């Protein structure tokens, strides 16, 4: 399936192929060891999760939308 992955910075938005949204979040975690992913919110075809620094400061939000 194709997913649109967005952040607060529109230049970082990408389309990714994945089996499900959890694969995208896990890939993000592997590639960004300095960040923590907070609670995951899912409603219909949209998944959102907050991204925090290792010190607990809010940095960004990932929004994953099924295409």
Please annotate each region the language model reported.
Residues 18-41:
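A short, charged, amphipathic alpha-helix used as a generic interaction element across diverse proteins
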Residues 10-20:
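A short, exposed loop/beta-hairpin motif centered on an aromatic-Gly-Thr core
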Residues 15, 28, 59-61:
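Short acidic, gly/pro-rich beta-turn/loop elements at beta-sheet edges
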Residues 33-67:
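Short, mixed-charge low-complexity intrinsically disordered segments
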């Amino acid at each position: 399936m194709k997913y649109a992955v967005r952040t607060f910075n529109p230049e970082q938005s990408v389309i990714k192929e994945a089996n499900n949204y959890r694969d995208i979040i896990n890939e993000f975690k592997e590639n960004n060891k300095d960040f923590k992913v907070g609670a995951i919110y899912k409603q219909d075809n949209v998944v959102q999760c907050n991204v925090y620094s290792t010190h607990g400061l809010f940095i960004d939000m990932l929004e994953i939308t099924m295409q």
